[in-house]
Design a protein with these regions (language model features):
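ATP/NTP phosphate-donor binding region
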Residues: 1-85
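Glycine-rich nucleotide phosphate-binding loop and flanking beta-alpha elements
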Residues: 40-42, 93-95, 120, 158
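Short glycine-/acidic-enriched loop or helix-start segments at secondary-structure transitions
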Residues: 43-46, 97-99, 123-124
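Residue-level detector of flexible, active-site-proximal loop/helix-junction positions
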Residues: 58-60, 93, 118
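Glycine/serine-rich anion-binding loops at beta->alpha junctions
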Residues: 84-103
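A glycine/threonine-rich phosphate-anchoring loop and its flanking beta-alpha core
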Residues: 100-171
């Protein structure tokens, strides 16, 4: 396992390697709510054995303010408060939506990421940019907010298509 801290308008701990088992040590005490997409939940059910994640639909077409609103409504329904930690488990779309929701829900709640794609590890999860699409324009609504940590567990890349691996290497 390799770990480093990244300082850009705040501090994020980035952990790289086979590290999902380290996650309990990284999570804060208190309530954690997980956000993922249906593909990740289906392909990696072992990641969600001890929780009831909020599942969004996969795909760029769901990276919208409507999805943000739906997630915020679900957080309200679950009684999430300012101390609730939001954990995004997925690729760049999930981490973008998670970071955006965490920044606007109750004017900001703490959050972190478990990136399940190589592209997500090298781009979306460590850039501090969290945006959603608006009226067909990519990332037109967004915020700059650093997660408390980013877990990049390389074993999670095993289910990725070669096209996704190439996209991550190119980034």
């Amino acid at each position: 396992m390799m770990s480093y801290s990244l300082q850009v308008a705040g501090r994020s701990r980035v952990v790289v390697g086979r590290t999902v088992e380290e996650l309990p040590r990284l999570l804060p005490q208190g309530r954690v709510i997980v956000l993922t997409d249906r593909n990740v939940a289906r392909c990696r059910p072992e990641l969600f054995e001890d929780c009831d994640p909020i599942c969004m639909e996969p795909g760029e077409e769901y990276k919208t303010l409507q999805t943000v609103e739906a997630v915020c409504r679900e957080l309200i329904r679950r009684g999430a408060d300012r101390t609730t930690f939001l954990l995004g488990v997925g690729g760049g779309i999930v981490t973008d939506v998670t970071g955006f929701v965490a920044s606007v829900y109750m004017r900001g709640v703490p959050f972190g990421f478990v990136s399940t794609t190589l592209l997500g590890c090298v781009d979306a999860s460590v850039g501090g940019k969290n945006g959603v699409n608006l009226d067909g324009y990519k990332n037109m609504a967004g915020v700059f907010a650093q997660p408390q940590f980013v877990v990049c567990d390389t074993s999670l890349f095993a289910t990725l298509p070669l096209r996704e691996i190439r996209a991550g290497l190119a980034e």
